């Protein structure tokens, strides 16, 4: 998994390690604003049984060819299979889960692939401690480890990072998705939040350049320039960069901390003209000894082993939710959960008990008498509990697990706002089709 010395020398690095990477050809990010990304004009199923076909058009309505959109049922049937993270043209981690009640060993690997690679959708959970063996087994949703694909990883001392490489196809596809949904619901306020990872925000730009990486801030700005001007684009890169010396990302895991999510929430509210509660209004809960996805993927490096993360959660007065379980039944749960007894690899699940296809939160005392739909990946788990303090009705869809129809949900619930919250490594061509499928 560790790169050969000649590849390491190619990057011009000393004393660092790169995992699961291949020599990358840097794709330049276009300067200035690009032309608006094409939209998908959705069609009903054809009479000959070929479902899910869409015509690809420019925003002004001119035909620009056709693109296939996966049949929604087929997409959902693949939940036990794979999940893609292609925006960074990173490599993929493949894990084969062996089910056993007593123990199971994880076989991990990675392939260097381009934008359209398929990753893994995680349905098991990590069970381990700093000394123990990594085990993956089926578990309740309360113990699931939320995770996106881990691509090329870079280890520098006590911190690990996931490398980012720009892909024109990936960001344009994501912009097309947002433009399509805006066209479908012209009266709904639509927002896009592309969340940078720790590599783009924390790591020295000079080191990024040595790794032949692309400018993440430029990539996000370019993606936003391709979106319909009605879409509210939220610049969280600058907001997070202003706090880069604070604990806004985990060092052993690919997620942000809830402190990072709070700064992003502040920026979202600012873009919408809303006020936010200070952190002093929340109850602070600390859960030490957290080892995240980077730690396990890198086979427990000593530099990370001796410096575990701490999960800090901010619990507001609204702390209840309803979520669908694996059988589609609506269950009661908490937005912030006590994680001290969770296994070291599971403690990010203190936020919303991990990933669920559908969540409802109702807060009659909220200052905003509005309803919002959040379409998210696992970065949203730390974000939604903050949002829930301020909105009367919050509906959350995780496109990787959702079994319903988001278009029907918007109409039935009278949803007024939609927020797409996706981390930078979780956007791309096929993922955009998968997100679009939940609206059909």
Where are these regions (language model features)?
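Extracellular glycan-modifying ectodomains
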Residues: 1-440
């Amino acid at each position: 998994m560790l790169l050969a010395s000649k590849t390491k020398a190619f990057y011009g690095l000393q004393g660092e390690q790169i995992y699961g990477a291949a020599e990358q050809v840097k794709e330049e990010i276009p300067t200035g604003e690009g032309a608006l990304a094409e939209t998908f004009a959705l069609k009903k199923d054809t009479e000959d049984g070929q479902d899910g076909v869409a015509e690809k058009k420019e925003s002004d309505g001119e035909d620009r060819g056709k693109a296939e959109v996966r049949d929604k049922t087929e997409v959902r049937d693949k939940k036990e299979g794979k999940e893609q993270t292609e925006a960074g043209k990173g490599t993929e981690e493949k894990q084969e889960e062996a089910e056993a009640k007593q123990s199971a060993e994880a076989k991990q690997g990675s392939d260097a692939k381009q934008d359209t690679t398929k990753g893994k959708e995680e349905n098991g959970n990590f069970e381990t401690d700093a000394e123990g063996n990594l085990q993956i087994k089926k578990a309740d949703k309360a113990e699931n480890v939320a995770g996106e694909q881990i691509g090329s990883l870079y280890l520098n001392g006590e911190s690990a990072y996931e490398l980012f490489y720009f892909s024109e196809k990936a960001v344009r596809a994501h912009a097309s998705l947002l433009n399509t949904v805006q066209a479908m619901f012209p009266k709904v306020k639509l927002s896009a939040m592309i969340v940078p990872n720790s590599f783009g925000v924390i790591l020295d730009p000079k080191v990024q350049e040595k790794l032949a990486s692309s400018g993440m801030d430029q990539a996000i700005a370019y993606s936003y320039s391709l979106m319909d001007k009605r879409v509210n684009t939220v610049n969280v890169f600058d907001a997070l960069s202003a706090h880069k010396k604070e604990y806004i990302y985990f060092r052993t895991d690919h997620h942000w901390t809830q402190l990072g999510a709070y700064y992003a929430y502040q920026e979202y509210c600012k873009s919408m003209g809303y006020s936010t509660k200070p952190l002093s209004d929340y109850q602070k809960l600390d859960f030490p000894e957290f080892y995240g996805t980077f730690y396990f993927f890198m086979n427990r490096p000593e530099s990370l082993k001796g410096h575990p993360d701490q999960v800090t959660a901010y619990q507001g007065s609204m702390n209840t939710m309803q979520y669908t379980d694996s059988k589609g039944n609506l269950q009661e749960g908490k937005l912030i959960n006590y994680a001290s007894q969770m296994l070291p690899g599971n403690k990010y699940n203190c936020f919303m008990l991990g990933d669920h296809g559908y969540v409802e939160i109702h807060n009659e005392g909220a200052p905003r008498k509005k309803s919002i739909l959040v379409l998210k990946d696992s970065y949203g788990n730390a974000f939604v509990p903050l949002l829930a303090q301020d909105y009367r009705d919050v509906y959350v869809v995780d496109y990787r697990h959702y079994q319903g129809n988001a278009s029907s949900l918007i109409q039935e619930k009278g949803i007024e706002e939609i927020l797409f919250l996706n981390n930078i490594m979780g956007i791309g061509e096929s993922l955009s089709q998968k997100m679009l499928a939940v609206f059909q």
